[in-house]
Amino acid sequence: PLPASSAASDVYKRQTMTRGSNDGGKCCEDTQTYVSWNWNAGNTDGKTYVVKVHDFSGNNRYIFDDFQTEAVTLDLAEGGTYIFNMDDSSNASHPFSIGTAANGTVYTSGITYFLDGVSKTYSEYTLGFSAATTRRLHITVPASAPVLYYWCSVHSGMGGQINTNSTLGSSNFDGTLQSTVKVNATAGFSIVSYTVGNSSGMTMGHGLGVSPVIAISKKRSGTSDWSVQFVNPSDNSTDYMFLNKTDAKGDTSTYFTSTTVKDGFGTGANGDTIIQYVFSEVAGYSKFGSYTGNGN
C-alpha cells in the first residue's frame, strides 16, 4: 500500500506496479531491482467516541473525546462499527442523532439506539434520553453510505458532517491535531493521516495502546524527505534520520507516548497533508534493534 492521494480522509490506497512501465523513473523499469515492504493494518474498523456538549462562546456544540474543537468533520469507514457514548451529563438535554442532512432526516441503516442497556426505537431513544443513565448510539456504516451528519434532535447547529469512506480508517482525537487512523494493535502497526497545523509540538493519536518505537513520515501534498523518528535501542533516547539521505542521525525530544506520536521532524509546513507508518514492538512477533557493521 502506498499513499496515492492527498485527501486527508484517505488513509491509504493501493497502487498497481507494472513491470517495464518505467513510471517516470520511479518504479518497475526492466533489469532494475526493487524492494517492497507491505503491512496489513486490518480489514475492519471500529472505535468508541465519548461525546460531550461544550460551550463555545455561548453556543453549545458536540465534542468527541474531549477534543476542544467545535463542529469537527468525522471520518468513518464503510463496514466499520462505531459506538457513540453520551453518558456525560452535559448531553442530558441534547439527544445525539445521525441523519442525511444537518439538523434533520434521520438515518436508519446500520444504527441501533440503547438507553440503560436496552435497545430502543428512535422515538423511544429521544423521549427517554434525558432520564437515562447510560446512552449509546451504535452504527455499522453500510457500503456506499452517503455523507452523513450528526446533530441534536432538539437544538439546531450543534453538530457537523460525517464522511463515510470506502478506505479504512477513522477519526482519532487523542492528540493536539485530529487525525485519521487505521490500526492493527495485534501486529503493532498503525497508519496515521493528518494535516499539519500552525503550532509547534503537534501530536496525533496512533491507536496502538502502547508507546511506539519507530515512525516513518512523508508529506503527501508535495515533495519532501522520508522522515524517520525512532527510539535508539542503545540508550532509549529519541533520534531521527531520513530514509532518502546519508546524513547521520540527529537527536530530538520525546516523540512517542502510549496514545500519541509527534509530527515528523522536517516533514511539512502548515497545511501540508502527511502520512505516517507507526510501529510498536509485539512480544513474540516483532522486535526493533540496531547493529554495527564490521566491513565484512
Task: Please give the residue ranges for each predicted region.
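Single conserved hydrophobic/aromatic residue that forms the stacking wall/gate
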Residues: 1-8, 12-15
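Short, structured beta-strand segments at or near domain termini in extracellular proteins/domains
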Residues: 31-41, 149-163, 174-175, 212-217, ...
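Glycine-rich, low-complexity segments
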Residues: 36-50, 57, 165-190, 280-289
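Extracellular/periplasmic metallocenter environments
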Residues: 51, 90-93, 115-168
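Surface-exposed ligand/attachment interfaces on beta-rich extracellular proteins
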Residues: 24-26, 67-75, 171, 175-177, ...
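N-terminal edge beta-strand
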Residues: 54-77
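Extracellular receptor-binding modules and their adjoining Ser/Thr/Gly/Asp/Asn-rich linkers
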Residues: 43, 182-200, 249-251, 255-296
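Acidic glycine-/aspartate-rich tracts in secreted/extracellular proteins
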Residues: 41-45, 55-58, 87-92, 100-105, ...
